[in-house]
């Protein structure tokens, strides 16, 4: 049987695996110790190690093959494109229903004078020595219990997704009364008090309650500009995209505004946006916060101000009663972000008394569309020593813009989450999970997010990420009758 390989589900039609290749498996290495005066050695244990091997490949290069006769450079260039990855890839034999997470190592050696057929080898490096089933599994909890059947020959990690049908101070999942993972606080002697109620939380799927900004420009050098453009629903119905940009100089864009249901003295405001940075260009998008008099109080947003470079940054600026700006946060993307084509950016501004806290994080939307693995995270605190920025937050606006005369790096708002912070009752437990929140736990990536916010800091001391063994396992969810929970896993093999 002629077989070929798939790399991230891609194949080359004229590339085949040479017959006779032996698939390596079960790479256990024993640890032993010699003892003087004793025959043999003492068994100290075993471990599953990483390993590498060569896959012999054949290039079909005749008139009947795909694209006919190919030159040395034609083949080499296609092979380089096929194998050139810095990160792990899914490596699968087309005839098998499992794959490795693999790296490739050079060199690729092709004979200068092509023969029929052309043979070469590619070195595969497995830092993760397991095989994974191509088909995933999932099961839904019934009465806060969920069964997991791992049909593989090795233990395997889980992905847990739990939607809160009530607010809660914690979420916990246990395995066979052996292992458990918990985020939050379940101390029964503390009363549960929800002192952080949502005031206005919205994903941008419609314009209900919003008013287009026509003449009221946004006086922010960092994140403002000329208004008058329009927003349309974009990103598969989940975002505000600016269109019909006004004819003016400088930053031009679209803005929309609304009042909050109530003014907030202490608050937590999160703005999320998506940035299309596959191509170069300048752009900015922000949420602006106003006081009850309609004066600008704060701006939180993302900007790429270079038309020929992909160097975005997150900016937070405060404004006093006179409108004078005070930039308290300016965080430039780490270099790992520059090569990503599409990113989702979260910015959170929290004010309690005279202390401002900023938390930002991002997701690679191409490789992590479910947003389980936050990257480029940062936090900072700033004290308003003179108490110049204490006015209540009453109105919010969303603004997206490009710079006139230059290519636009498209940036679209995805959502705005505005929460009031009331005085914390003495001895109360924090309600870290609100009704409707989605808790996501990735046991392999060792990440936990609540409503796409990284919450590893809330992981309970003593709990840990765990795998389920080969065969049957029973998982229990706590607290009872609070979460709709689904567990996902892949069978894993030695």
Regions found by a protein language model. Give the residues of each.
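Extracellular/virion structural assembly segments
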Residues: 1-200, 263, 276-297, 417-494
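Extracellular/lumenal carbohydrate-interaction signature centered on repeated Trp-anchored short motifs
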Residues: 257-269, 336-343, 466-468
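Secretory/extracellular carbohydrate-interaction modules
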Residues: 207-324, 412
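Flexible glycan-contacting loops in extracellular carbohydrate-active proteins
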Residues: 369-412, 467
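Extracellular carbohydrate-recognition regions
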Residues: 151-153, 178-235, 408-411, 420
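Carbohydrate-binding surfaces in secreted/extracellular proteins
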Residues: 269-271, 336-384, 447-450
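Broad, structure-driven detector of short, well-ordered beta-strand segments within folded domains
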Residues: 296-306, 345-351, 394-399, 439-442
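Short, aromatic/His-centered strand-loop micro-motif at the edge of beta-sheets
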Residues: 315-348
């Amino acid at each position: 049987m002629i077989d070929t390989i798939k790399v991230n589900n891609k194949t080359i039609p004229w590339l085949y695996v040479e017959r006779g290749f032996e698939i390596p498996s079960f790479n256990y290495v024993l640890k032993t110790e010699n003892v003087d005066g004793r025959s043999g050695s003492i068994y100290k244990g075993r471990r599953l190690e990483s390993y590498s091997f060569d896959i012999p490949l054949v290039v079909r290069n005749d008139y009947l093959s795909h694209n006919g006769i190919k030159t040395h450079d034609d083949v080499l260039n296609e092979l380089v494109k096929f194998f050139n990855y810095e990160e792990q890839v899914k490596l699968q034999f087309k005839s098998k229903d499992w794959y490795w997470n693999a790296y490739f190592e050079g060199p690729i050696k092709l004979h200068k004078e092509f023969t029929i057929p052309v043979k070469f080898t590619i070195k595969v490096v497995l830092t993760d020595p397991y095989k994974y089933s191509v088909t995933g599994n999932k099961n839904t909890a019934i009465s806060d219990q969920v069964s997991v059947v791992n049909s593989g020959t090795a233990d395997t990690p889980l992905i847990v997704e739990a939607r809160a049908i009530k607010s809660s101070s914690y979420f916990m999942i246990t395995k066979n009364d052996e292992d458990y993972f918990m985020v939050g606080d379940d101390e029964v002697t503390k009363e549960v008090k929800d002192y952080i109620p949502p005031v206005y939380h919205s994903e941008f799927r419609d314009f209900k309650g919003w008013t287009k900004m026509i003449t009221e420009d946004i006086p922010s050098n960092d994140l403002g500009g000329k208004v008058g453009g329009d927003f349309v629903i974009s990103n598969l119905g989940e975002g505000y995209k600016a269109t019909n940009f006004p004819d003016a100089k400088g930053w031009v864009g679209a803005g929309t505004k609304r009042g909050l249901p109530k003014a907030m003295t202490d608050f937590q405001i999160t703005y999320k946006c998506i940035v299309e940075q596959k191509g170069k260009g300048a752009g900015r998008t922000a949420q602006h916060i106003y006081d009850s008099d309609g004066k600008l109080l704060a701006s939180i947003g993302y900007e790429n101000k270079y038309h020929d470079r992909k160097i975005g940054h997150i900016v937070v600026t405060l404004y006093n009663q006179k409108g004078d700006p005070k930039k308290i946060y300016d965080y430039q993307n780490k270099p790992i972000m520059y090569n990503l084509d599409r990113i989702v950016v979260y910015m959170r501004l929290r004010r309690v008394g005279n202390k401002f806290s900023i938390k930002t994080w991002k997701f690679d939307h191409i490789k992590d569309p479910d947003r389980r693995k936050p990257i480029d995270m940062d936090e900072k605190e700033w004290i308003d020593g003179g108490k110049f920025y204490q006015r209540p937050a009453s109105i919010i606006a969303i603004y997206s813009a490009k710079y006139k005369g230059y290519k636009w790096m498209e940036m679209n708002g995805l959502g705005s989450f505005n929460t009031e912070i009331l005085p914390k009752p003495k001895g109360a437990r924090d309600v870290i999970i609100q009704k409707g929140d989605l808790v996501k736990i990735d046991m392999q990536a060792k990440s936990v997010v609540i409503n796409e916010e990284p919450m590893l800091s809330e992981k309970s001391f003593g709990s840990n990420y765990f795998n389920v063994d080969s065969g049957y396992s029973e998982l229990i969810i706590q607290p009872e009758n609070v979460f709709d929970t689904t567990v996902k896993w892949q069978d894993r093999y030695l």
